[in-house]
C-alpha cells in the first residue's frame, strides 16, 4: 500500500495549514466526494466546485504536478484536472488562495518545490523515506495499492 500526500519545502509552515484544511475536508465529507468523482461506482457524479463566495485575498499558490497519472492528475483539453487538482483547489478555497497548477516532469517536482518555483507538489506522490529527507509531507490523504494482472 502506498500513502499519497502533498510535499512542501522543509520547514514551510504552509504545510500545517494544509493539514488543518485536509482534516476539515475529511471530516465534512468533501475528500470522499472528490475521490468518488474519479474512482468507484459514482465517477463523474460529484464534481468539486469552489463556493461562490471564496475569499482569495491571500494570493496565489503554485502546485507542481505531472499531469500523466489519471485519475490523480491529467489533462482535459488545456486544463489539468483530477483528484489532486480538486483536493488542492478545495484546500486553497478554505485557506483563501488562488490555485495555479504547473505541469512538469515528475522527477523535477521536488526540486521545483525546494527552489521555490512551486509552493507545493501534488502528483499522486508516495511518501517514502528517501523523499522525506528532502521535503516535508502533509498528512496522508489517500492510500493506493498497485497490482499486476496477468492472463491465466
Positions of the model-derived regions?
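Short, well-ordered beta-strand segments
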Residues: 7, 61-65, 149
